[in-house]
């Protein structure tokens, strides 16, 4: 990597747009929100028109999200864990579930449900991702029910099946319960749980 100032980042955004990129995707930007805001303001002032995607773990500070209101078009958060104990054990962040709920509420307040243009590309709204983990069907079900009840039954959901045990998880018996890939049955059950909750818009 290399250090860039706000103008240089804005230049890159505009260059990507000129090359035909469909959006400007900011991946895991939670720790550099002030710099993101400065760069976006510069790029928009210079004509940036592509949708801005905020791609996040959902472990975001509310103040940071509120400062992005009007700058971000598409929020793409993960919702990883429902239980504090699971978040503490696997992510060392026991407050993740409530932080994610607060963050996703704020994201939806700003941009609403995901909407598409005539070209079939997403233009504005919320897209929530959930990574299916082995043995965590009940947590997935709780997440989906909350999304349907508290955010919107029209929430666009990406149920992701690509979990792989790596690094310590793959070698250390402390994480034995997640030291395997989810089964096809677990993935199917995640989709079924989402449908039972009332969700119906899925990324495939």
Where are these regions (language model features)?
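Alpha-helix-loop-beta-strand connector modules within alpha/beta enzyme cores
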Residues: 39-53, 99-110, 182-193
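Auxiliary Fe-S-binding modules of radical SAM enzymes
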Residues: 112-204
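Anionic-ligand binding region
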Residues: 87-119
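Short glycine-enriched, charge-decorated loop/helix-capping segments at active-site entrances
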Residues: 2-3, 89-94, 172-181
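Short, conserved beta-strand edge motifs with alternating hydrophobic and charged residues
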Residues: 53-55, 76-79, 100, 127-131, ...
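Active-site beta-loop-alpha junctions enriched in small/polar residues
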Residues: 29-31, 57-59, 80, 131-133, ...
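Conserved Radical SAM active-site core
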Residues: 1-74, 84
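Non-cysteine beta-strand/loop elements that form the S-adenosyl-L-methionine
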Residues: 69-84, 156-163
């Amino acid at each position: 990597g290399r250090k860039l100032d706000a103008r240089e980042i804005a230049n890159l955004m505009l260059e990507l747009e000129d090359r035909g990129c469909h959006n400007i995707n900011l991946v895991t930007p939670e720790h550099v929100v002030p710099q993101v805001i400065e760069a976006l303001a510069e790029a928009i002032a210079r004509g940036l028109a592509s949708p801005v995607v905020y791609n996040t773990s959902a472990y975001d500070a509310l103040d940071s999200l509120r400062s992005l209101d009007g700058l971000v078009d598409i929020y793409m958060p993960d919702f990883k864990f429902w239980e504090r104990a699971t978040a503490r054990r696997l992510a060392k962040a026991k407050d993740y579930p409530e932080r994610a709920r607060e963050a996703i509420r704020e994201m939806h307040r700003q941009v609403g449900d995901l909407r598409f243009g005539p070209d079939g590309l997403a233009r504005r709204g919320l897209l929530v991702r959930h990574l299916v983990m082995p043995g965590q069907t009940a947590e997935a079900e709780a997440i989906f029910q909350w999304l349907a009840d508290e955010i919107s039954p029209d929430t666009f959901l990406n149920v992701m099946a690509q979990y792989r045990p790596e690094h310590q998880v793959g070698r250390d018996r402390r994480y034995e319960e997640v030291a395997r890939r989810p089964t096809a049955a677990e993935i199917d059950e995640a989709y079924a749980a989402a449908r039972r909750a009332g969700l119906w818009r899925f990324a495939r």
